[in-house]
Amino acid sequence: MVCVTDQNNENPSQNRADKLPKSWDPKAVEADLYQGWVDAGYFTADPASEKPGYSIVLPPPNVTGQLHMGHALDHTLMDALARRKRMQGFEVLWLPGMDHAGIATQTKVEEMLKETEGKSRYDYSREEFIEKVWEWKKEYGGKIGEQMRAIGDSVDWSRERFTLDEGLSRAVQTIFKKLYDSGMIYQANRLVNWSPVLETAVSDIEVVYKDVEGELVSIRYGSLNDDEPHVVVATTRVETMLGDVAVAVHPDDERYRHLVGTTLPHPFRDDLTLKVVADDYVDPEFGSGAVKITPAHDPNDYALGLRHHLDMPTIMDKTGRIADTGTQFDGMTREEARVKVREALAEQGRIVKEVRPYVHSVGHSERSGEAIEPRLSLQWWVKVEELAKMSGDAVRAGDTTIHPKSLEPRYFDWVDDMHDWCISRQLWWGHRIPIWYGPDGDVICVGPDEQAPEGYTQDPDVLDTWFSSALWPFSTMGWPDKTPELDKFYPTSVLVTAYDILFFWVARMMMFGTFAAKETPELLGEGTDGRPQVPFTDLFLHGLVRDEHGRKMSKSLGNGIDPMDWVDNYGADALRFTLARGANPGVDLPVGEDSAQSSRNFATKLFNATRFALMNGAVSEGLPERAELTDADRWILDRLEEVRGHVDDYLDNYQFAKANEELYHFAWNEFCDWYLEIAKVQIPREGVTERGRNTQQVLGHVLDALLRLLHPAMPFVTEVLWKALTDGESIVTSSWPTPADTNGGAAVDADAARRIADVEKLVTEIRRFRSDQGVKPSQKVPARLDFAACDLTELEGAVRALVRIEEPAEDFEESASLEIRLSTATITVELDTSGTVDVAAERKRLEKDLATANKELETTGKKLGNEAFLAKAPDAVVEKIRGRQQVAREEVERITKRLEELG
């Protein structure tokens, strides 16, 4: 490594190199860098700024949570967008916050109280318990904020929000009252997912399905005499027959047509009879072709019950125990009743058949683990028809654009066929439903600035967490008040989230956002063509993070990755670049340790390249005249401009993977592997030349722009390197590269690009030939080739240095030669390798390499010949193995040929 100095002046670039440590250690700098950014106010948005506004609201993580890989992907992409827009001259608001997470938080606190005090929530008043939750939130709720800082989130911490903040509570009460007064909120007895342990309704997203081993029991209803009316039905939940009110058959099933319209007695209940009804829902080919109907405890039965106006008796209380059946089974748990009811039916001779084991999928509570009970319950609901239509219209009209467009149909599937939304939860932690009941039966909705009359009592339920989350884009900016934030930053520019919460959160934000804008256009702005304003103009949906084999991360598989482990082991930039480099719109992203190590190596490569450039005089102070530059200089500047243009196009369209892959390839394969190596030749070892000074300027110029292009994905290493290179205040406040920062807007020099491509091919082929001949990489050999014939005279010195060949002596005699086809001619390279190769040692090395290649060929062949593996493995994994097989096959051919040449 050489350092160019002027004899009369100290080299400023050498001084800047001294500011860098000897090696890149992210742990040593990341925390201080981040705090410095925050203290400098770089992330604080100013609504009074004259810059154009750009805003993102962070999908609020649960206050109970810790950062997982899905969060890390979300945050990396949002941060990349925010950092780039700041550099492009926008006033950026990236607004952070947390969700109160009703069920999750209440469950955590109840578990804590049970462990520490041996008490349940019922041992406290409601107010006392809620105070306990606030205490817990204060002590434990900041974990995810610390992790956000660790990965570099450039959020405006001064505007951090919590869904139970006073301002957000006011927004919740306001929209509830507006919806209620518009007739869009109502109370009704309908089927819900019920958690007997939590004693509340839960949303679909809080239900996880597991395969359960049970038994399929066939029950005979009606007469035990085969000559008299009877029907056989099958069930895995025998206990629910206590709530059966009907048996359904297909209208065209001749076996049961004579029974349709009749009734059968209930085996245990005198107050119920079983009506035989005909319905297309029934599959006549499945089982007996008859289905037992329990409308209050099964969603399909409930829908059928509505169609046929059936009674809907509930047979379980809120704890999941049998209740109000008037039978000996009252008071039993579901599991106890399942056994006892089957035994009692068997005593009556009504058990026709039992199938054990019978594996079926059963919904379980994500929080408490027990089987969810579909249960008829009095709840509060949002009527969604009009809201869903506005949400669909907004996307169809282009007010909100979904990226990728291929996910639009999934969005329309939700909003075009949406069912009314159950918004009440039987919890204590959350937004209390603002409905009050008078002593004479009056029901009123009380707004945020109103008081309930004396003697009225408030509804005990709280709202579904997703209700307050649906207001997040505008409630966090001060709605229902008129605020500078809403004027400047609403609607938000983009929502970034995973496609799996398209319905649970995204569609509901669209519903409430358009409704709030329709009701208060003076606060949220007017939409287009009379439509309400939308909460975000772009919606970017990314995929899910999976393990390196494409499998979903789960506790049962033990394949989860803690992103903070990667931050500790490889640095935040490695985590971020791995995720950004793999983030294709709407496509799942497989990651593994190899990915993180590769990204860490890339950060180290950037560090070493910058340090080398600085030690060799690189300066960022403009460019010489283009005519004074070498082919290599013009080529790297032109490539930089091409890459900049592509990266801009990709990022404008949320193509994060393509943008970062292109930057990776340019930085590693073109700038480091080729231009830096050529620059070593262009910068003289001693003294100063015009070409050397020009190269130093080009080195600094390219590095300056490259670091700025990489900054959104890799903020920490680029900050350290950019400051050392430029002596600038911070890369955060630098400008995003334009053509003026790359090749000065010049036309691409196609001849220079052609000659560099020829150099790359020439060097690669000679290196490969040397290796095949057994010549050590460090060993110089004499060689003869005509550089003028292939238009590479200017680059002769670089080529000779890169492939370790020297000018031949007068008595030169070739011992080997190769022909290489370049763009303008075929060049013959003659080499004298005599005396440079130990034939015996070379043969031994080649035989060892051949054994390794054959083993790889065998291993990949076995995998690709395994039909079971091919059926299960993701396409990407199979293609990777095919690639390995092809490389191994080529290696076997190459080594075998070389061994034959050695004789």
UniProtKB/Swiss-Prot annotation:
Belongs to the class-I aminoacyl-tRNA synthetase family. ValS type 1 subfamily. Catalyzes the attachment of valine to tRNA(Val). As ValRS can inadvertently accommodate and process structurally similar amino acids such as threonine, to avoid such errors, it has a 'posttransfer' editing activity that hydrolyzes mischarged Thr-tRNA(Val) in a tRNA-dependent manner. InterPro entries: aa-tRNA-synth_I_CS, aa-tRNA-synth_Ia, Anticodon_Ia_Val, M/V/L/I-tRNA-synth_anticd-bd, Rossmann-like_a/b/a_fold, tRNA-bd_arm, tRNAsynth_Ia_anticodon-bd, Val-tRNA_synth_C_sf. It catalyses: tRNA(Val) + L-valine + ATP = L-valyl-tRNA(Val) + AMP + diphosphate. It is found in: Cytoplasm. GO terms for cellular component: cytosol. Residues 1-15 have a biased composition (Polar residues). The lineage of its organism: Bacteria, Bacillati, Actinomycetota, Actinomycetes, Mycobacteriales. A motif ('HIGH' region) lies at residues 61-71. Residues 1-22 are annotated as: Disordered. A motif ('KMSKS' region) lies at residues 552-556. Its EC number is 6.1.1.9. Its main location: cytoplasm. GO terms for biological process: valyl-tRNA aminoacylation. ATP binds at K555. Monomer. ValRS has two distinct active sites: one for aminoacylation and one for editing. The misactivated threonine is translocated from the active site to the editing site. This is Valine--tRNA ligase. Keywords: Aminoacyl-tRNA synthetase, ATP-binding, Coiled coil, Cytoplasm, Ligase, Nucleotide-binding, Protein biosynthesis. Residues 836-902 form a coiled coil. NCBIfam families: PRK05729.1, valS. The gene is valS. One of its GO terms (molecular function) is aminoacyl-tRNA deacylase activity.
